[in-house]
Every structure is written in C-alpha cells, then in structure tokens.
C-alpha cells in the first residue's frame, strides 16, 4: 500500500504552518473567554479539563507510540496494516471503557467535584471519543497536509462555535462544550479520513497485540 511521500523540507514547512496556527489560536480564544465568563469561570473549566486529561491519557494506553512503531513496518502490506489498526482500535475501545468507568467512580467519590458535575460530564465526551483519534495513522504515512488542513478547519469552526455559544458570564458550560467540539472535530475527521489508508473493524481474538 504505497502512498506518495514528500520531502523532509516540505513536511517541515507544512508542520510549521500547523504550529503557527496552533500558537495563534489561544491568543484569540483566551482573551475572549476570560472577558466573557471571567477568570474564575475560565479557571474552573480548565481545572476540570486538566483532570480529564489524565483519563484521556489512560484511555490512550500508549497506543499511538506502539501504532507508529509497528505501522511503519507493515504500512505497505494493506492486510497486515488493517489487522494492526483493527486490533489497536479494539484495544482502545476497551481501555476507553475502563478509563471512563474510573472517571465516573472518581466523580462521585470526590467531594471537590460535586460542584462541577455538569462541566465534568460534558468534558468527559473527550474520553469517549479517544478511540477515534487515530492520529498515529497519519504520522505513519507522513500525511502532514491532512493533519494541517484538518487542524486549521477545526480551529476555525471551533472559533465560530465559541463566538456563537459563549456570550455571557453564565456560559461556563458552553465553554466546556466548545472545548469538546475542538477535540471531537479532530477525532471525527481522523476517523472518517482513515478510510483512505485502512479498513477498521472490531477485532477480538486470543492473539491480540498485548
């Protein structure tokens, strides 16, 4: 399954464009959000989001690193690559279920989280969407054009969503929704576009990767 590859210079230039957009984005969103919902509201959502990051990390289970390493070896054999992706996708679903279970348990046993339940459950959608990430596939095939274009599109759409739904000081939960839209957009794009490189199926057998 040979795909067109680009030079290191080209890939570096594309990646630099993505990096510039990623750096500029917070310069627009953070001042707007802190002005509308206040520093306290911004801090609350980002505090919960930082906690959620640990559960997302648990759900990812180091699959991206393993996928890149093994994917590079078999990327020219579609059958083997499909098998690798399907097995890792299945493992990721299982790890996501486990991680989300820990999240629910944590939410209800932590006194500090009781005042943030709505925000926490909105942001927890990030955990559930983790299996759709599949970012490692595009790193295997060095498809930095897709990664860059996808990132820019999602950031622009997310910015529009932010301006539409976050309009006053009470829109703290709406800000959490905006964060989910940013994350979900990338993951959904990744899953849909992955069909260019592989066929993903739920695959369970005794010879799973780990």
Regions found by a protein language model. Give the residues of each.
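N-terminal membrane topogenesis motif
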Residues: 1-25, 79, 86, 195, ...
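Interhelical loop/hinge segments that connect adjacent transmembrane helices in multipass membrane
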Residues: 1-4, 8, 145-148, 172-174, ...
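Signature of the first transmembrane helix
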Residues: 6-64, 159, 183
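Membrane-interface junctions at transmembrane-helix termini in multi-pass inner-membrane proteins
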Residues: 9, 73, 117, 128-149, ...
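Membrane-interface helix-loop junctions in multi-pass transport and translocation proteins
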Residues: 34-42, 108-117, 142-187
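Membrane-interface alpha-helices at helix entry/exit sites of multi-pass transporters
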Residues: 43-44, 78-91
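Alpha-helical transmembrane segments of multi-pass membrane proteins
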Residues: 54, 58, 97, 104-108, ...
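Helix-loop junctions and terminal segments of transmembrane helices
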Residues: 60-76
């Amino acid at each position: 399954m040979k795909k067109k590859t680009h030079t290191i210079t080209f890939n570096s230039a594309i990646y630099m464009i993505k990096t510039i957009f990623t750096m500029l984005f917070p310069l627009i969103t953070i001042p707007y959000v802190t002005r509308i919902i206040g520093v306290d509201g911004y801090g609350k959502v980002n505090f919960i989001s930082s906690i959620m990051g640990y559960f997302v990390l648990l759900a990812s289970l180091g699959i991206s690193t393993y996928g890149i390493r093994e994917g590079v070896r078999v990327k020219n054999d579609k059958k083997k690559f499909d098998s690798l992706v399907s097995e890792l996708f299945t493992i990721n679903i299982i790890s996501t279920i486990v991680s989300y279970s820990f999240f629910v348990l944590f939410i209800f046993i932590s006194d500090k989280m009781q005042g943030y339940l709505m925000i926490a459950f909105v942001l927890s959608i990030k955990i559930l969407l983790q299996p759709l990430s599949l970012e490692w596939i595009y790193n295997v095939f060095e498809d930095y054009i897709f990664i860059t274009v996808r990132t820019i599109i999602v950031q622009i759409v997310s910015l529009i969503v932010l301006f539409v739904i976050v309009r006053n000081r009470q829109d703290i939960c709406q800000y959490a929704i905006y964060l989910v839209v940013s994350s979900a957009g990338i993951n959904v794009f990744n899953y849909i576009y992955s069909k260019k490189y592989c066929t993903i199926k739920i695959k369970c057998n005794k010879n799973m990767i780990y």
